[in-house]
Structure formats: C-alpha cells, structure tokens
Amino acid sequence: MRSSLRAWQRRCIDAALEHYSATPHFFCQATPGAGKTRMAAELALALLQQGKIDLVLCFAPSCQVVDGFRTTFSQVLGQRLDGLIGAVGDVCTYQGMEHRTEAFWKLFDEYRVFAVFDEIHHCAGHDPLLSNAWGQQILQRVQDQAAFTLALSGTPWRSDDRGIALARYSNPEGRLICDYRYGLREAVADEVCRSPRIVLLDNHKVKLTEELENDSSTQVFPSIATLLRGSPVSYEDLLCHDGLLNQLLGLGIEKLDEVRAIKPDAAGLVVATNIEHARQVALALAARGESYRVVTNRTPDAQQVINEFKSSDCRWIVAVGMISEGTDIPRLQVCCYLSRIRTELHYRQVLGRVLRRTGSTDNLAWLFVLAEPTLEEFSQRVADDLPEDLAILTQVQVPAMGLETPTDDMTAISQVEGLASKDSDRHAGTNVESALSLSCLEAPPIYQISFSQHYRQQLLVVC
C-alpha cells in the first residue's frame, strides 16, 4: 500500500525505520490534516512485516480519535485492533490508561510492543516531578518497556510550558528536538493541505454606553481591540453579542455558499463557547434557514452524531469541546471560531479541522474570527510551525494534573438538525445596533454595547 502514500509519509517512515536501528523513540511533528494516522499505520505494518514487533498499542486524547485510529490501522494492517483474542493490538484514550489492569501492562514485558501516541502534547512527562497523570503512565509503564514508540503531534507544545512525554530537548537551550517535521507550508505546496485564509472581523465604531441612575455616558471605540483594552467589556461578552455573532456567521454562510458551488458536500464548523452559547448559535443559523447539527461534551451518542454528519448533506455542525484535534471530517472547509479559549494550541488545532484536502478543487480553507488581539497574533503566525516562544522548555513548578479540558455544567442541547424553512432568507440582514448587558445576572444593566453597520474584514493569506 506504500505506493499510495504521500511523499512526506514515505520519507517519515524511512526515517523512523532507520532511527529505530539505534534508538527506540521517534518524535514526529506534522501539521494537522497531513495524514499522521495513515503514516503511523503504515509504519506499524513495516515493523510487523520485518518481524520486529508483535503487538501495536495506540493511545489518543479522545474517543473520536480512538475510533479513527482503530479504523485506519485495521484497514492498513488487515487485522483487528480491538484488544480481543486474535487482534494485533488495541487503541485506548489517555484517560483510559489509568484504568488498565496489570494484565494489560504486562504485555509490554511479554511482547515486543510498538506504542503509538497521538497528540502527545497532552502528556506532560519530560520531568517525573512535573508530569501529569498521563505522562506518568508513559514514564513508568511504557518508556523503557516498549520495543518502539512513535510520538505524534501537530502542535508540540503545552499551554503550561511543561515538557512533553517522550520528547527530547536540547541542552542548555531547552529546544524541542523533532526526529521528523512536516510543516504547513510544505503541506500546502505538496497539495496535502488546503491553504488557510483567515478573516478577522472588526468594527470601526463601537459604542459603549454607561447607564447611571440619572445620567448616561457614551464612549466610541475605533476597533474591537481598543474596546477590550479601554473598557470593562470582555472577549466573552462579545461572543454572546447578537449583532456581532450574526455578522460573523453571515460571513461564514456566504463563504460556504461559494465553496459549495464548487464542492457541493462542503460543510462549516462553528466552535462555540459553552452549551448555552451553542444554543444561541443554533438559533441564529435556524433564523437564516441553515441546516445544522449540535454536538457538545454532554450530547448523548455524540460520536454517532459526528459520524452521521460526516456523510450527510447538512451544512453546519456547532460544537462545544468535541471537534478540535484529531477529529476527521474532511468535508469541513469553513470555520467560525467563537470559542472563549485563547491558547495558540487550541486555535491551531481548530484550524486543522478545515485543512484536510480531499481533491483538486478544495484548495482553500476559511476561518472567520473576531479581531481580538491575541487571536490576531495567533493568526499572523499560523505559518510558523513551531513558534519560537513556544518551542522552548522552561522550568516551571506546578502540581501534576490531567488534561486541560473545558467543562460546562449546563444542560446539554438535544442533538437536532435545524428545521428552519429552506424558503426563508438565509442572508437576512443583522441587527447591527443590538445591545448587550455586561451584567447578565443583574437588572437593570449598567453597560450596553452596540456596533455600527461599518464592519471591517482583514484577510490573511497565510501560505
């Protein structure tokens, strides 16, 4: 099957096989959407055919990624990867490692195991004193026991600056050493990934009104950035503003229309802040006649909803804490980023959901985001595969902890498809002067914010 591999995948496999002749640990950084899972499966096949391993055990950050790994590896290896009798191996989540029995870990002592770790940056484990629970499992159970390991990541750094399990860092600089690197620029040039187009939405006349008992005062800000710097308004407040939300969604809908004229099954992703926010987004899409699905970290049978969306004609999927890294929905080509999470790791992983290229006509990916200063900075350097300030390991003293996963205690939205009439106007104008209370639990509101009809769009052509 190697004849159907991409050039970078063949080069990486060859590099790994040569590397394994001297050392058992191989670290691969490849841009999201490049095809890391397929490469890993083909590498496992090569090791099996060479008689160097007996079992393949894979670990991944989520159930969605586990399912994808199991499917891809089974297809490539021609054997089951379900952990049952007769299988060549198994796949489990990092969280599931903590619940594995001693019989599972004895496999590393009794067999030659090839251990594959997807999105390894979730596992802090460079220093035993600073490792999280998942990193400790790798350090104690796998690192010295596995015949070979393959660590994969598209974004090999952590938001807490701790070192990554199975990673090597230069001394004294503390710079991450990758055994193989395949960046976004290369992937776009090789027509493996779509070229990202990031649209930053801004407004040149934002009014903030402070209402007092007997008086009120109004300030006008020339941009979202100045509003956030010079007022009590937070980024989270803006995400819930109906006018701004509708404007951003409108841009996404318009772009999806253009894309579907060329690629009829193309779809869009909206990353929402929490479950209530997802409900607000869903209502806005319904008002425009858009078909949609909602999937959250509280949705029953969430994986089934995602799987059905993959092969459906539904235009949008609204997600909270579900569709980020590793989730493979190739028809996603447009994304509206409305998450409250502002870390570069999360931002790049979300962008990666629309980068996977499937043909000759889907060469562009579109991301729409508010012109918030931090997100604008992230956008400007998307083409930098390993940002200088994130590539350095610094010494930090923090307690061991698990994965930083956004949680939400609200009641889950039912998994429904938008039922708005297709005859309604999907491009209706937005209420550009709608007001937002900054004190959601108090009445009457103290501050109100409104946006003029004069929105600005900045298009970033990344690579």
Residue ranges of each PLM-predicted region?
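Interdomain helical connector at the RecA1-RecA2 junction of SF1/SF2 helicase-like NTPases
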Residues: 161-262
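Conserved pre-motif I regulatory segment
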Residues: 1-29
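Conserved RecA-like P-loop NTPase helicase motor core
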Residues: 291-395
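Long, largely alpha-helical accessory region at the distal end of helicase-like NTP-driven motors
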Residues: 238-240, 244-247, 251, 255, ...
